[in-house]
Every structure is written in structure tokens, then in C-alpha cells.
Amino acid sequence: MAKQQDQIDKIRQELAQSAIKNISLSSELERSFMEYAMSVIVARALPDARDGLKPVHRRVLYGAYTGGMHHDRPFKKSARIVGDVMSKFHPHGDMAIYDTMSRMAQDFSLRYLLIDGHGNFGSIDGDRPAAQRYTEARLSKLAGELLRDIDKDTVDFVANYDGEEQEPTVLPAAFPNLLANGSSGIAVGMSTSIPSHNLSELIQGLILLIDNPDCTINDLLGVIKGPDFPTGANIIYTKGIESYFETGKGNVVIRSKVSIEQLPTRAALVVTEIPYMVNKTSLIEKIVELVKAEEITGIADIRDESSREGIRLVIEVKRDTVPEVLLNQLFKSTRLQVRFPVNMLALVKGAPKLLNMKQALTVYLEHQLDVLIRKTQFNLKKYQERFHILSGLLIAALNIDEVIAIIKKSANNQVAMEALHERFGLDEIQARAVLDMRLRSLSVLEVNKLQTEQQELKALIEFCQQVLADKQLQLKLIKEQLTKINEQFGDPRRSEILYGISEDIDDEDLITQENVVITMSTNGYLKRIGVDAYNLQHRGGVGVKGLTTYTDDSISQLLVCSTHSDLLFFTDKGKVYRIRAHQIPPGFRTNKGIPAVNLIKIDKDEKICALISVNDYQNGYFFFCTKNGTIKRTSLSEFANILSIGKRAILFKENDVLFSVIRTSGQDDIFIGSTAGFVVRFHEDTVRPLSRAAMGVLGINLNQCEFVNGLSTSSNGSLLLSVGQNGIGKLTSIDKYRLTKRNAKGVKTLRVTAKTGPVVTTTTVFGNEDLLMISSAGKIVRISLEQLSEQRKNTSGVKLIKLKEKERLETVTIFKKEEAIKTTTATETDDVGSKQITQ
């Protein structure tokens, strides 16, 4: 026991005499963690605000520079660059260095490439670069501008990790790389995320800052529009852009560039540019996942047609889906649209600092001033040293005989140098230069060259001294340098900035506001077609096939409206349903369309009898008329909250159905026509307004087997158009029709014969509209009413459309020429001048 105790005492004595100290564990953890955190912040994760580079990026570029891998030299194996960098400057894993170098060679990662890569350096699909032994690389031409004049003492150098090499603490950076290429990184307790910008815009911003140091953030926003990402895409201008310009923090909304193309059988969404840092393969997988989960149901097929020419992702749209609405769903559910968080944190004088746009530009500008001053000082010293030597050489040349004699008499160089100093006042440097001078330099020609060089050096010395003394001249030189960079490397924006678009996407934000024709068949198939799809034909023309129908189906409704209009569907059961016009999928003249039951909750035995487009529910009335002549007037405001599930619009007797609904102003004359060729005319205000659920009053007195065939107003025209079932029609002035009371028999307007057939349409027009007629076979003929001459009452009219045997006229629609051509805007009238009348 005593022996063991002696050993313990001995160990305690040795420990007491050693350098081991007793310290607090919590204090040591705090100190060590702070050292680690600062190491990560300063030496790994955050870029320097001056050159925009992290240490590993700087070391890769400088390693390639010292290895002679310039842009005008042959490519070298990537493994050679990685090996040089790892052995001299960055003693970490080779894959970390290679990944860094590869990223600087990827045009989808960096806005302005710093490495010119040769071989497979990865793809936007997430493919990794080929092994470094297979790929080759060199500095890009633009990277040379980052390193320009680095050999002129423009930046500080420090010893590398083993003290055998010197590496720069920052690069001269002749262009603002921090903002041009951006940066991202996660440190301890902080992170940075800086978007790339357009180099030309940045240089314009720097020139603005030089010319006007007091410029505001708004001034900078005038020239630097916002981020400009390597992959292009669209940027939605939001307050987030203004925020990071002002504070250094914000969000940028990036939206894929997508067009809608019409394939032979269906529409397709074609994606040609995707947001920055979005993996294309992962994007496709996410879309497929959503389709399988039935979260998105409008996609028929998706395929990747990308090539060397660029991205092309084709998403085929199902026929019953509106492409714009599907695109909106994809923007909301996938990375076709992303938010890029901006946190402009960078190292300023070795410490992390959050910079706004002006501060970032100012830090770079100060760095350029420092680089210019140091380069000028370096050049000045070099010029002065050379000037000093030339002065000695010229003294010797002018006294060459005496100089030669002194040299010949001298025992050695030291004696000769002392003699030259005593005789001509030459210092050691000048005397040594004289001794090193070759005999051929003594010729008159060479002496003249020395004198010329001395004069040039004198001018350069004076210029350098002027630069060092004049800050405005320094700024002027920087402007000239930036202008040259812009001329050589400036390029157009890749990312288009969209103004006036809400960040919160609504379906209609993506739908073009334009005039369309909405058609519906007897069996309830709806279709949306562009107005220009129909050919204007001369009176009596045969027409074009307007709609392919099933064997027992034919066209019953047609309406011209805006894609942003409300569509109100009035049914023969007296109900009304509402959707937006763009919810009807676009189609072709020859396809069948989409069943109305897919869009509105209509009963199987319910038939749509009127379509009306509305944008404003504040003014006007709906005027109803049933097939048996019952009428009702109701304010538009009572229909403002109609849904697709429908509401009651009118009540009527059990043996009746709703024939038509029109819009009125409250001051119109109402015209109601019958199949027997009679028309009744009365003042609208003789019918008092009733609620939606009310039953109306009689408007026309009909005989048995007679039905209403037309409902229109005096504000819709000064002529009355009457068209028979066999395509015979005519125009008559409404002045020929006297006012009557409602529920009158009316006056004769068209003489009904076997040639005319029953009257299918009676409506008011101005006479300068276009007339669209649809036959039972689906033919559409479009003529101008200006081709028809005015006729008297009770005449038969002229042929308007050629019909085959057993073919009859089903639908007649009137619309204004101008509004059928131009795109409807939000400020235009609700109805686009359209009137539809059905038998």
C-alpha cells in the first residue's frame, strides 16, 4: 500500500509541475465554439464583399492562374487543377474542390462563368460531373478580369497553410462579381443568399453611383431592374425586390416561362425556362406524383423534350381542362414557381455585414479605388526606378570615353563603381547598370531610344502622380475600365421582370383577355373558340363546319363575350347558373366540346335556353320571357352572387318553360315575336321589377300552337330582323311597328309561307352588325347585315343561307364587327354587343 501511495504522490507531483491547467468545461466549450464559428464564417461560408468569392473559389481561380490555365491557353485536366489547389492552398478533400470548380463551369449555376469547362460538368437534371480525370478546364476570359493586375501588388497576400506559398486574401476583381454571380452559404448562426444580376445593369449602377454618390435606392432601381438568373425564367416584380435593395433582405418570386401551344388534338403547356436552382427531373417527378394522387387532374401526358438547344418540357392538357387554370395549379403546387430568399450577408473588413444594394456597390467601388491606387503606386515605383537607371545610362553615354577609361583603370567592379560615383555622382544602382551596359547601347540610335524612353517615363510618372493626387481622376479611370468590361462582356437580361402581376396568383391572372365564341349543342356540349376561327362569308354562302356533333345533336346556343366575363346560364326550368368564360376549355371548330354538366350542377332534364355575359351587376335588368309569353323584369344586382350550383331565376306555370333572357336598361321598348310572324312592342317600364323567385305576367297573346321566337329591345337597333326556318330573312324599320300594350296580339312582320317556314328569329339590329347563322347540320355562315336592304312589313324576304334538303336553320346570333375582332378590355361593355336567339 505504501508503494502505491508513493506512486500516486509522484504522479500528482508531476502533474503539478506540468502545463496542464484546470479550467471550466463551459468556458472551454464557449471559447472553442466561438473559434469554430468564426472559422466557418470567415474562412468558409461567407463571400468577401469585394470580390464576391469564398476562400475555396478564390483558391481554385488563383491556382488555375498560377498554373497557367488562362483562357487563351490549351485546356488542362481538371485533376491537375484540383491537385495543385489541394497541395498548395486548400488542404481538404479533392471532391470539395472539384465540386466548386465544376459549379463555376455550369451555365445553369453561374450567371457569368468563371471556369471554361470541357467535358461533362453535370446538368440541370441533377446529373453529377464526370470524374475529374476525364474533364478538362481553364479560366474563362471573364475570370481573367477578376485576376487582372494581381501581380502589381494590388491586393494583400498571406502565407498558405504550410508557409511555403503565398495566396491572395482577395482578388482585384475588375467587375462586381458578388452581385453579378451572387452567392449562397450557411455559416454558424447566419447564412447568405445573394441573387445574380445583369452585369450591364450593375455597371450602369456603379457609374450612376460614381456620378452621383447621393443617389437613392429608387435611382438604382431605375437602372438595376432586379435579379437576373442563369436559367432565365420570369421574375414577378414585388415589394420583395424593393426590400432587398433597401435593407439587404427580401424575397424574389421566380416563375417558369411557359407558353400554351395547340397540338393537333389538344392544348399543351410548354415549359422552356425554369426557376434558378430547380432540378428539372425532380420537378417532373413532383408533377407525376400530383397526378397519381389526383391532386391535379387536367394532365393527359408529360414528356421531356429538352436538348442542347434548351429546356422543353411538354405537359399535354386534357380536353376538358382550361390550360390557364391548370398552369395556375402547377404554379401553386410545384416548383414551376418558387421564392428566392435574399439575405445579402458578406464579409466587410473581415466581419459579416448585411448590405443593401447601394452599400454593396459602395464596398466594391472602394475596393476598386484601393486596387487602382496600389497599382498606380506599383507602376510609379517601377517607372521611377527605370527613370533613375536611364538617367545614369545617359550620363555614361554622353561621357562614354571617360567612362571607358575609368572602367579600364579600375581593378574590379567595386572600384569602378566608386570611381563612377566620385566622377559623375552615380549611385550604386546606376553605376551597376552602366557596368552591365552592352557596347551596342553606345550607338547614336540606341542613345536616342534611351532619351525617348526617358521622356515617356517622365510622362507616365507625372500621370501616376496626378492619379494619386486626384480622386476624381481615379473615379474617371474606374468608369472607363467598367465601360470596357461592359462593352466586352455585357449581355441582355435572361430573366424577364413582369410588372403589375400579383404574387398571389388567381386563375384569371394567367388567362388572356380576348373575345371568344361560346357555343353549346342541344345535348349540352360547351366549347370556347376564338372569333377569328370563323370565315366571313357572302350572303347565301354554304359556310364552314362549325361544330362536330353526335348523330342526335345539333347546335343550339352561341355567344360572343370576353374570357374574363361572367357567364350566366338560364335554363328552361327557370334556374340560373354562373361560371367564368375562361372555365370553358378552348376547342376547335370541329371538336365536340365539354358537357355543361362538368361545369354547372344542372339536372339531366334541364336545358339551357340563354347565355348572357356580365361584368357589372350594378346597373340594368334581366328581362325574362317564357315560351308561352310570360314576362318578368328583375334587377341585375339580384344575380351578383349566383354560383355554379344554381339558383331560382323565375317562376312560371307547370306547362311552360323559359324561352329567353335579355339585358335591359330600364328605359327600353320591348319586342316579342312569335313563330306565326307577329311582333308586339311595349314600354319596358310598364312591367314593374320583381324578385328572382317571383312569377311574371303575360307579354304577348298567342294562339294555340304559337310560341315565342324572339325577345329584344329598341336600344339594340333601329331595324327588326326576321328570319324563317328555311333561311329566308329580311330587315324592317322598327318605326313601322306601333306601340301596343303588353299581352297584345301584335302586328305582322314576316309573311309565313312554305318557302319561309315558321319564323325562328325576330330581333332588333342596327344593320351594320355581322349575322352568324347555324344550321341543324352544324354549318356556320357569317355575313354582314349591310348586304341586306330594308323591306316593308308582311313580306317574305331574301335567302340568307343555302340549306340542303331536310336541313333547317337552328340558331341566329348578332354581334358588332369591331367587338368581334378586337380584344375585350376590362373597361368595355359587359355584353360585347352579342345577341343570341334560338327557335
UniProtKB/Swiss-Prot annotation:
Keywords for the protein's UniProt record, in alphabetical order: ATP-binding, Cytoplasm, DNA-binding, Isomerase, Nucleotide-binding, Topoisomerase
One Pfam assignment: DNA_topoisoIV
GO CC annotations, alphabetized: chromosome; cytoplasm; DNA topoisomerase type II (double strand cut, ATP-hydrolyzing) complex
Residues of the Topo IIA-type catalytic domain: 46-510
Keyword Cytoplasm appears in the UniProt entry: yes
InterPro entries linked: GyrA, GyrA/parC_rep, Gyrase/topoIV_suA_C, Topo_IIA-like_dom_sf, Topo_IIA_A/C_ab, Topo_IIA_A_a_sf, Topo_IIA_dom_A, Type_II_DNA_Topoisomerases
GO terms under biological process: DNA topological change; DNA-templated DNA replication
UniProt GO molecular function: ATP binding; DNA binding; DNA negative supercoiling activity
SMART domains on file: TOP4c
Keyword DNA-binding attached: yes
Active site as annotated: Y134 (o-(5'-phospho-dna)-tyrosine intermediate)
Top-rank taxon, per record: Bacteria
EC number: 5.6.2.2
Location(s) in or outside the cell: Cytoplasm
Record's catalysed reaction(s): ATP-dependent breakage, passage and rejoining of double-stranded DNA
Motif (GyrA-box): 537-543
Main location: cytoplasm
Disulphide bridges: none
Function, in words: A type II topoisomerase that negatively supercoils closed circular double-stranded (ds) DNA in an ATP-dependent manner to modulate DNA topology and maintain chromosomes in an underwound state. Negative supercoiling favors strand separation, and DNA replication, transcription, recombination and repair, all of which involve strand separation. Also able to catalyze the interconversion of other topological isomers of dsDNA rings, including catenanes and knotted rings. Type II topoisomerases break and join 2 DNA strands simultaneously in an ATP-dependent manner.
Subunit and partners: Heterotetramer, composed of two GyrA and two GyrB chains. In the heterotetramer, GyrA contains the active site tyrosine that forms a transient covalent intermediate with DNA, while GyrB binds cofactors and catalyzes ATP hydrolysis.
Further details from the record: Few gyrases are as efficient as E.coli at forming negative supercoils. Not all organisms have 2 type II topoisomerases; in organisms with a single type II topoisomerase this enzyme also has to decatenate newly replicated chromosomes.
Family of this protein: Belongs to the type II topoisomerase GyrA/ParC subunit family.
Stated name of the protein: DNA gyrase subunit A
Organism of origin: Mycoplasma pneumoniae (strain ATCC 29342 / M129 / Subtype 1) (Mycoplasmoides pneumoniae)
Gene name as annotated: gyrA
